[in-house]
UniProtKB/Swiss-Prot annotation:
Record-given protein name: Alanine racemase
PROSITE patterns per record: ALANINE_RACEMASE
Species annotation: Geobacter sp. (strain M21)
Keywords: Isomerase, Pyridoxal phosphate
Disulfide bond entries: none
Binding positions for substrate per the UniProt entry: 137, 317
Pathway field: Amino-acid biosynthesis; D-alanine biosynthesis; D-alanine from L-alanine: step 1/1
Top-level taxonomy: Bacteria, Pseudomonadati, Thermodesulfobacteriota, Desulfuromonadia, Geobacterales
InterPro entries per the UniProt record, alphabetical: Ala_racemase, Ala_racemase/Decarboxylase_C, Ala_racemase_C, Ala_racemase_N, Ala_racemase_pyridoxalP-BS, PLP-binding_barrel
MF-aspect GO terms: alanine racemase activity; pyridoxal phosphate binding
The enzyme's E.C. designation: 5.1.1.1
Cofactor (UniProt): pyridoxal 5'-phosphate
Domain of life: Bacteria
Residues bearing PTM N6-(pyridoxal phosphate)lysine: 37
């Protein structure tokens, strides 16, 4: 049994709360396609997906086929969409497990069509046409959609189940960001209209990510794709205070050692922290190998006994040191909240940690190592 005190607590009650918030933010009749890629943003895909399925989520989205297979193997029966498409040789498994995939090339279409024909399971390959409306990543360029759809008709073993796109700057609420999101929405709507003009009847139309859901400035969709908002974090600081979401993840550890140091004493690699007065230093067994960013050196904060303590010196692979001089009553064995809500009321949010680390909340949550840090599920 792993007795290391550095663990992640996942609050399923907070997940349920956030799911309910999202349901209230989308238009009536709009379903939810929960994004559970990257191990549910580090929260653990199995428990999170099982909980969301109980809540009535309409479908799940993952990044690649192996993640979709994991969902099916864990007993998830709701529709699953591979956002990043599949690779050559994966067609038969995709169809056999009744998983849908993004499609953005005729070569993919031909391979899927042939696989569906060969396995003779009397099931078409379900595809969602990915349209590049301005992200510049995956997808059929929006101006090529009419020609692509016309050529797609030659493949009789494919079912165009959905059509979707992805916003590039929906999390930026400045005039330029808003204008580009609206331009993407116009391009997407035109692609959907073209599909219908050519006789396609996609069951699912989706483009709204967490940022678009929060902004509530949506083109017509009958499916929305909440991701980070389900886990209680915000797409960007532009949405701060707009929605009472609850952090689902708490990264915690314990004080392993306390040591008084004299003025002039340096702490950790590179001597980047030097005590200017007598200080009490706590060593805590968490480090960058656990996903606690090294860039939090001399910047990060933690909560002990409801009081804040600053990281003292360079974040190590397995350890950080905290200046706990002003933490009243601190003792070896005390709980340390490194990320998420503390039982005494304060919170180290993913947004706060990301700002100090020079990154984004997504990277903070996804970066907490699953192989080193146990997940404990509550609620």
């Amino acid at each position: 049994m792993d007795s290391r005190p550095t663990v992640v607590e996942i609050d399923l009650a907070a997940l349920r709360h956030n799911f309910s918030l999202v349901q209230k933010r989308v238009p009536e009749g709009c379903g939810l396609l929960a994004v559970v890629k990257a191990d549910a943003y580090g929260h653990g895909f199995q428990y999170v997906s099982e909980e969301l399925e109980k809540l009535g989520v309409d479908a799940f989205a993952v990044a690649f086929l192996a993640e979709g297979v994991q969902l099916r193997m864990s007993g998830i029966t709701r529709p699953v969409l591979i956002l990043g498409g599949i690779y050559p040789g994966e067609e038969r498994r995709l169809i056999g497990l009744n998983i849908s995939t993004a499609l953005f090339s005729l070569e993919q279409a031909a391979a899927l069509d042939q696989a569906a024909l060969e396995i003779k399971c009397y099931r078409k390959a379900h595809i969602h046409l990915k349209v590049d409306t301005g992200m510049g990543r995956l997808g059929v360029p929006y101006h090529e959609v009419p020609e692509f759809l016309a050529k797609l008709k030659q493949f009789k073993n494919l079912e165009l189940e959905g059509i979707f796109s992805h916003f590039a700057s929906a999390d930026e609420l400045d005039p330029e960001g808003i204008a580009f999101t609206r331009l993407q929405a116009e391009r997407f709507n035109a692609a959907v209209e073209e599909a219908r003009r050519q006789g396609y009847a996609p069951s699912y139309v989706h483009v709204a990510n967490s940022a678009a859901i929060l902004a509530q400035d949506l083109p017509y969709c009958n499916l929305a794709r909440p991701g980070i908002i389900l886990y209680g974090a915000l797409p960007s600081g532009d949405f701060e205070g707009q929605v009472p979401s609850q952090p689902v993840m708490r990264l915690k550890s314990r004080v392993a050692m306390l040591k008084w140091v004299e003025p002039g004493t340096s702490i950790s690699y590179g001597r980047r922290y030097v005590a200017t007065e007598r200080a009490l230093i706590a060593s805590v067994p968490v480090g960058y190998a656990d996903g606690y960013c090294r860039s939090l050196t001399n910047k990060g904060e933690a909560l002990i006994r409801g009081q804040r303590a600053k990281v003292a010196g360079t974040v190590c692979m397995d350890w950080i040191m905290l200046d706990v001089t002003n933490v009243k009553g601190v003792a070896v064995g005390d709980d340390v909240t490194l990320l998420g809500p503390d039982p005494m009321g304060d919170c180290i949010s993913a947004e706060e940690m990301a700002e100090k680390a020079g990154t984004i909340p997504y990277e903070v949550l996804c970066g907490i190592a699953t192989r080193r840090v146990r997940r404990v599920y509550l609620g």
